[in-house]
Curated annotation (Swiss-Prot):
Biased composition (Basic residues): 235-248
Region (G2): 375-379
Chain residue ranges for the region called G4: 450-453
Subcellular location: Cytoplasm
Protein species of origin: Pseudomonas syringae pv. syringae (strain B728a)
Keywords: Cytoplasm, GTP-binding, Initiation factor, Nucleotide-binding, Protein biosynthesis
Alphabetical list of PANTHER family matching this protein: TR-TYPE G DOMAIN-CONTAINING PROTEIN, TRANSLATION INITIATION FACTOR IF-2-RELATED
Low complexity bias: start-end ranges: 136-175
Protein name (database record): Translation initiation factor IF-2
GO molecular function: GTP binding; GTPase activity; translation initiation factor activity
Start and end residues of each stretch annotated as G1: 350-357
GO cellular component: cytosol
Region (G3): 396-399
InterPro entries: DNA-bd_dom_put_sf, EF-G-like_DII, IF2_assoc_dom_bac, IF2_II, IF2_N, P-loop_NTPase, Small_GTP-bd, T_Tr_GTP-bd_dom
Originating gene: infB
Length: 841
């Protein structure tokens, strides 16, 4: 027995001697000095006291974990061996007798409850069947006497009929007894069933036995297949029931295809589509491979492709639009208030050579207040003019780009269209296009017959040509006013403005100035010093500096607003064009502008629109383009160039069809998938999108719906007015070559040092040639602060009052610009030439 002193024990347990002596006295030991000896029994007594003091239970462990490890060697080819180590772990838990008894009692209670429920259900089922038999027996007993009186053996059957009523009392025990008996002999019920279904003779001779066998299966099967079997499975499968009986009424695979409702948004991935159809993603990928399109499970599909896949696989498709955010935005923009009259918004349209720009310049010079040098800054595309009868807002939209964009988005930014027609030139294809734009938008027309001061002017011919296209003059009984004007002399301009204001009174244009501002973008640009600048036309409400605006997929707070004269303004009412600064990007022409209450909402909608546009653009990245078709012309298989062709007249369409179908050889061919007479419509654009075709327009133009699809889907659309150009371009496409590009080479740059007047040419710019050489009769651009404000032709070039064909760098010269008088000191005149350069793949 090991004996140690108190001091040594204190050192072992790392406790001060005084503290250890105190604990020993508390344990009932008689030690008082550090040199006294401590025996093992005294150590055990001290340990027991310390454990009881910390409330630690002194008991044996209830759970024991045993780990077993075995190592073996596995021989493989090449005289190599691999060592394999297998580890096993077993856990033994010791339960107290009380816990074991409680567990056993709980299982007994659960089993007894299940058996009672099964017995009660069997009794109810037997009682129900007995009642049904009792109701059916009187009918049989009434028909039996007529046929059974001569036969004495039938009497027991008639006596048994009334006795069927008290059967429910004894039906349940007999059913339980049969059930227990049949569980011990599982093969007998099948034999009895076969005998019961054996033949007609046995059923005729023993009808009472047949009725018993009809009632027997119900109580025998029902209790066992529901509660008792499920209870036996919960007990770990130790029940006496057969497992195969559980599958008697189990799941069976459907015999026919399951048709599901598939909701498809504007974009959907292959995995999401397969999940909605309850098929494996591999099936969808295999189907796409058969269609010739390899995809992955995470690839984004557009709405049309996903709809085709789901319908081909036999499912119902519901097309949904992810516009919940847009709908909530539209609800928040509704405003009710008092409406007042507003100024009309007028767009001037027509052929570029018919005097549209000259008419606008005259109206601007005549109606803008004096003191504003040069009138209105030319890069602003919208301005308003004050007249005696009210204000008129003009939209200067070259090429009608903003007008078609507005129509594509359903906006009614333009109220009246002034159609300019040259009296000496007549109706041109672009004039017809302008009429179609106005009719499609539901905008009234005012026809301005320009150049009436020329000798060849014929007003009746203009009326006759326009009446063919549905524009009838008021003099001829129609509703379209015709005004004869001369933009050069100023004749009839006041009458034209009078007619425009009269049309505005008929339209009864209204607006609510107290509402939040709402408008449309006329144009936008990126200014070097001010950032994104957008020219917007306020359509309704009032736009104020500091408002949070949402413009298409861009947003921002208005930091500054400028009117058409470049002066800062604090607010702008209906029909007033202004420039706004503060957006996070340059919006597209035609985008709608709305004033929102908070920045969070504006940012959320803008990001939603950007993501939506990005997804749709990625999904449609493989749309048919002419360049993509040209790049693949060198492949071995025969290629087909699909074309949708629209012409102005039937004769041109037939000639083009014959010429294009005759092109091609063994490797390439042309196929005209669609065509017709008239402008390019939305259905034509959809046909080109579905067939990966190119849109060709011969003397026709696309309407707003078609241009919207072309812009969104990235389709290739080309306009022609010479039949040989179409044939030549298609030949180049079929031979793997592209048409030529027009490249501009800058020849020289001159800076305006002084401006003086000439009675013959108007404003003459005294310039110093800074770079290159300035040539006469070459196209030029006028730049103000490095921004193009005019493009025209150099009409006069002189040096020391002598005409010069060219002036080199470092020399001074006088330059006269054709049809342009707004030259200022500091402007730069850029002379360039256009060179055709062949494109290469």
């Amino acid at each position: 027995m090991t004996q140690v002193t108190v001091k040594e024990l204190a050192k072992v347990v790392d406790t001060p001697v005084e503290r250890l002596l105190q604990q020993m006295r508390e344990a009932g030991l008689s030690h008082t000095a550090a040199e006294q000896v401590v025996t093992d029994n005294e150590k055990q007594a001290l340990l027991t006291h310390l454990k009881s003091g910390h409330k630690a239970k002194v008991e044996e462990p209830r759970k024991i974990t045993l780990q077993r490890k075995t190592t073996s060697t596995l021989r493989v080819a090449g005289s190599k061996s691999i060592s394999v180590e297998v580890r096993k772990k077993k856990v033994f838990v010791q339960r107290s007798p009380e816990e074991i008894e409680a567990e056993r009692k709980r299982e007994m209670d659960e089993r007894r409850a299940v058996e009672n429920a099964a017995r009660q259900k069997a009794e109810e089922e037997a009682k129900r069947r007995a009642e049904e038999d009792a109701r059916s027996q009187p009918a049989a007993s009434q028909s039996a006497p007529a046929a059974a009186e001569p036969v004495a053996a039938a009497e027991p059957v008639r006596e048994a009929a009334p006795a069927a009523a008290p059967a429910p009392a004894s039906a349940a025990p007999s059913a339980d007894a049969r059930k227990r008996d049949e569980q011990r002999r599982p093969d007998k019920p099948r034999a009895d069933d076969r005998n019961a279904r054996g033949g007609d003779g046995e059923r005729k001779n023993a009808p009472h036995r047949a009725s018993v066998k009809e009632k027997a299966p119900a109580p025998r099967v029902a209790p066992r297949t529901t509660d008792e079997e499920s209870d036996s499975f919960r007990r770990g499968g130790r029940g006496k029931g057969k497992l195969k009986k559980r599958n008697a009424h189990g799941f069976q695979s459907p015999t026919g295809p399951v048709i599901r409702d598939v909701a498809i948004g504007e974009t959907i991935t292959v995995g999401e589509l397969s999940a909605q159809m309850s098929v494996k993603a591999a099936e969808v990928i295999k189907f796409m491979f058969k269609m010739g399109t390899p995809v992955t499970i995470n690839q984004v599909l557009d709405q049309e492709t996903a709809q085709l896949i789901a319908e081909e696989l036999g499912h119902k498709v519901t097309l949904v639009s992810d516009n919940a955010l847009e709908d909530s935005l539209a609800e928040s923009l509704k405003f009710e208030g008092e409406s007042f009259s507003r100024a009309p918004v007028v767009t001037v349209m027509g052929h570029v050579d018919h005097g549209k720009t000259s008419l606008l310049d005259y109206i601007r010079r005549a109606k803008v207040a004096a003191g504003e040098a040069g009138g209105i800054t030319q890069h602003i595309g919208a301005y308003h003019v004050e007249t005696e009868r009210g204000m008129v807002t003009f939209l200067d939209t070259p090429g009608h780009a903003a007008f078609t964009a507005m129509r594509a988005r359903g906006a009614k930014a333009t109220d009246i269209v002034i159609l300019v027609v040259a009296a000496d030139d007549g109706v041109m294809p672009q004039t017809i296009e302008a009429v179609q734009h106005a009719v499609a938008a539901g905008v009234p027309l005012v026809v301005a017959v320009n150049k009436i001061d020329k000798p060849g002017a014929d007003l009746d011919r203009i009326r006759s040509e326009l009446s063919v296209h549905g524009v009838t003059s008021e003099e001829w009984g129609g509703d379209t006013p015709f005004v004869s004007v001369s933009a050069k002399m100023g004749t009839g301009v006041d009458e034209l403005l009078e007619a425009v204001l009269l049309q505005a009174e008929v339209l009864e244009l209204k607006a609510t100035p107290s509402a939040p501002g709402r408008g449309v973008v006329v144009e936008s640009r990126l200014d070097k010093g001010r950032g994104p600048v957008a020219t917007v036309l306020v359509q309704d409400g009032t736009l104020r500096q500091g408002d949070m605006v949402l413009v298409g997929s861009n947003f921002g707070r208005i930091r500054a607003m400028l009117d058409e004269n470049g002066k800062p303004v604090k607010e702008a009412g209906p029909s007033i064009p202004v420039e706004i600064l503060g957006l996070d990007g340059t919006p597209d022409a035609g985008d709608e502008m709305s004033v929102l209450s908070d920045e969070k909402k504006a940012r959320e909608v803008a990001l939603f629109r950007q993501g939506k546009f990005r997804e749709v653009k990625l999904a449609r990245a493989h749309a048919g383009k002419l360049e993509n078709i040209f790049e693949n012309m060198g492949q071995a298989e025969k290629k087909t160039l699909n074309i949708v062709l629209k012409s102005d007249v039937r004769g041109s369409l037939e000639a083009l069809n014959g010429a294009l179908n005759g092109l091609g050889n063994d490797e390439v061919q042309v196929r005209v998938v669609g065509g017709g007479v008239g402008g390019i419509t939305e259905s034509d654009a959809n046909l080109a999108l579905a067939s990966n075709a190119v849109l060709f327009g011969f003397n026709v133009r696309a309407d707003a719906g078609a241009r919207k699809i072309v812009e969104q889907e990235g389709l290739d659309m080309r306009y022609y007015n010479v039949i040989y150009d179409i044939i030549e371009d298609v030949k180049k496409a079929l031979t793997g070559m592209l048409g030529s590009d027009v490249r501009e080479n800058i020849l020289g740059i001159a800076e305006v040092r002084d401006v003086f007047r000439s009675p013959k040419f108007g404003a003459i710019a005294g310039c110093m040639v800074l770079e290159g050489t300035v040539y006469r009769n070459r196209p030029i651009r006028v730049l103000r602060e490095d921004i193009v404000i005019f493009e025209g032709e150099l009409e006069s070039l002189r040096r020391f009052k002598d005409d010069a064909a060219e002036v080199r760098a470092g020399m001074e010269c006088g330059i006269g610009v054709k049809s342009y008088n707004d030259v200022k000191v500091g402007d730069k005149i850029e002379v360039f030439e256009k060179v055709q350069v062949a494109r290469s793949l």
